[in-house]
Design a protein with these regions (language model features):
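Conserved ATP-binding/catalytic core of the eukaryotic-like protein kinase fold
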Residues: 1-190
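Phosphate/oxyanion-binding loops and surfaces in catalytic or ligand/nucleic-acid-binding neighborhoods
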Residues: 59, 168, 190, 216, ...
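An acidic site on a long C-lobe helix of protein kinase domains
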Residues: 79, 157, 202, 221-224
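Short proline-rich PxxP-based motifs
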Residues: 187-200
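Conserved C-terminal C-lobe helix
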Residues: 201-214
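Juxtacatalytic C-terminal regulatory tail of Ser/Thr protein kinases
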Residues: 208, 219-267
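Membrane-anchoring helices that localize proteins to membranes
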Residues: 270-275
Length: 275
């Protein structure tokens, strides 16, 4: 089975939308990763561009959060690791997703997370694609610099990942406003609600990772996916030791960790200097 994304005729006649669609095909076709939905083919039929994806049976991460209310702490960490690994594969190819949200993460029947819909992905070495400063991302998860129309980088995806992790742990996004613009400005100006107040069993180490992911100052935010993954893996090990074991996707993620990492319990998580 496959999934086909077809551009509507009226959108296909819009040169900007058409370029965005073609860009998605080019960007995702470069990526091959177990946590990214694979592009099988792309082209145009009778003037209508299309992309053929692998079909992923399961549900979106958003649907999973809505169904369960919130996720287990260890499962939340595991999905964050898988998403970070997927984003890392994209960032290493100079591709920024720009719209990281749980609606764009599929959870397959085996419980694995797969990132999809690079519909507004942009290669870092392309120029002029956001010269008008438009905010293209979903504002519930939008990074402050993206909301302000500034340069968007891999760090912007990491901010969005932090918001997704917050939602997995609490069952809700951190900000609610009258409209999408109001929410975007809350990302620019307001501190996130206290994660541990919302969910007391979240450890200080995990809360510190979320804080650093969602730092508004780029200098305080994680610089790249490698540090994020390293810290999340260590937090998962600590959570495993504290709870006496994990289930579900956290078990699968633990099996992917280096043997040396699995032996180091408890593990120290690097805290940002400003905490």
């Amino acid at each position: 089975h496959v999934a086909i994304r077809l551009l509507h005729r009226e959108i296909a006649s819009d040169s900007d939308q058409l370029e965005r669609f073609r860009r998605e095909a080019r960007a995702v076709a470069q990526l091959s990763h177990p946590h990214i939905v694979t592009v099988i083919d792309a082209g145009e039929d009778d003037g209508r561009p299309y992309i053929v994806f692998e079909y992923v049976a399961g549900e979106t991460l958003k649907a999973r959060i809505r169904r369960l209310g919130r996720l287990d702490v260890s499962e939340s960490i595991a999905y964050a690791i898988e998403i970070a690994r997927a984003l890392g594969a994209a960032h290493e190819r100079h591709i920024v997703h720009r719209d990281v949200k749980p609606q764009n993460v599929l959870v397959d029947e085996e419980g694995r997370a797969k990132v999809t819909d690079f519909g507004i992905a942009r290669t870092l070495d392309q120029e002029g694609l956001t010269a008008d400063g438009r905010v293209l991302g979903t504002t519930d998860y939008v990074a402050p610099e993206q909301a302000l129309g500034h340069e968007v980088t891999g760090q912007s995806d990491l901010y969005s990942l932090g918001i997704v992790l917050f939602e997995m742990l609490t069952g809700d996004v951190p900000f609610r406003g009258e409209n999408q613009v109001a929410v975007a400005m809350m990302h620019v100006r307001d501190d996130l609600p206290d994660l541990q107040a919302r969910r007391p069993e979240v450890s200080a180490s995990l809360a510190a990772v979320v804080d650093r992911l969602t730092a508004k100052d780029l200098g305080a935010r994680y610089p790249d996916h490698l540090e994020v993954i390293a810290d999340l893996e260590e937090v998962l090990m600590v959570e495993t030791a504290r709870s006496g074991g994990v289930t579900g996707e956290a078990t699968a993620v633990l099996r992917t960790l280096p043997e040396g990492t699995r032996r180091r319990v408890p593990l120290r998580v690097r805290h940002p200097a400003w905490l």
